[in-house]
């Protein structure tokens, strides 16, 4: 059972919250997380890159020069890959880069990644509670009160963030907001600090406990 110190939005300590998630064995955790990240990045690829082979390039019915008598190597088409304007040999074609990983492994990888970052977690009882209207500077000042540097990449995890909070965070380059039930391994590992709302911790327990 891991205990996380909770803070108020003004940076003062308010108590503790417990988070206990089942993780992968130490011997297999690195491989599991690696495969989960590879899958996530691969599945983001569009796979729409496409080139033309010699048979697909427009033209090419004409021989560039006669078969014999020139002293040069014979060529049958002006669209051979050996000539400018010719086709591409083994070029990319549209394809799917999607990788499979079963749901049980995906959940285990996510829990393992999250628990491995527990020392970088800031649990906040009332994130953005003073915000009445979208204001980027209030979020930046609030993160500073929580002990987070402006140069650090921050992942903010909330249960059901308001539109005011969404708009306030949207304009901050190094801060990303994500819902507690939409976590992913890459964002968890990519951030320097994780700021989690107390209600989001309860949501994480509910959604990812098993």
From Swiss-Prot:
Transmembrane segments: none
One Gene Ontology cellular component annotation held by this UniProt entry: ribonucleoprotein complex
Renumbered residue ranges of the record's region Disordered: 46-89
DNA repair keyword on record: no
PANTHER family: 50S RIBOSOMAL PROTEIN L4, LARGE RIBOSOMAL SUBUNIT PROTEIN UL4C
Summary of the function given for this chain in its UniProt record: One of the primary rRNA binding proteins, this protein initially binds near the 5'-end of the 23S rRNA. It is important during the early stages of 50S assembly. It makes multiple contacts with different domains of the 23S rRNA in the assembled 50S subunit and ribosome.
NCBIfam families: rplD_bact
Name recorded for this polypeptide: Large ribosomal subunit protein uL4
